[in-house]
Amino acid sequence: QLGDLQTVVVYRDRIASVRADAAPGDDAVVVDGEGGTLLPGLTDMHSHVSDWDMPLYLAGGVTSVRDLGNDNGMLQDLVTRTESGATMGPRATLSGFLEGRSPYSAKFGFVVGDLPAALEKVRWYADHGYRGIKIYSSMTPDWVKPVAAEAHRLGLHVSGHVPAFMTAERAVRDGYDEIDHMNQVLLSFVLTEGEDTRTPLRFTAVGERMSKLDLGSEPVQRFVALL
């Protein structure tokens, strides 16, 4: 059930108040809502934006997006154009894609072959206005802890897939603030040693084996307690 008609006061880029008795000032711009329904802006917390979908976000009521990995040149150009008003689109919070080098490497962001290069790219992201990094599946597990430590030193959020041959528990202990995708958590409890999550197994193993997982088992409960 909808409430009574209200007046929404916007000051600069923020909603200042929602009241039934707000009187507009002499210099206020008044937009007649004509008895319609107003929703707060929605946020897409896991996106990979592109030129064509930015206006569609606004059309769907999404006013903020969190981009979790993209082509860095394209993304920076798109955000610059959006913030200047040259392109319509939501506000974007950026996390930089960081991948290890392997035959399975994803091709966006930075693909690194050693730890010094990984740390250098973390610093690049911090210097270019990114709010976090997203670690991907081919990252060497032993690099995660120093990479996360450097990211945190620079005030960056750390998220990502769980690298192949690493458990979700170790990823959290080594510095992850967030694991992207629920399958990346569940794989730790249904895989056998040596199985490679850089393959379609990261999808099929969860679908085929989850029904046999005991959620009360010690590994699952230990992980829940860790969180």
PLM regions and their residue ranges:
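Histidine-rich, glycine-flanked metal-binding segment
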Residues: 2-39
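Divalent-metal coordination cores built from histidine and acidic residues
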Residues: 33-39, 49, 53-170, 174-227
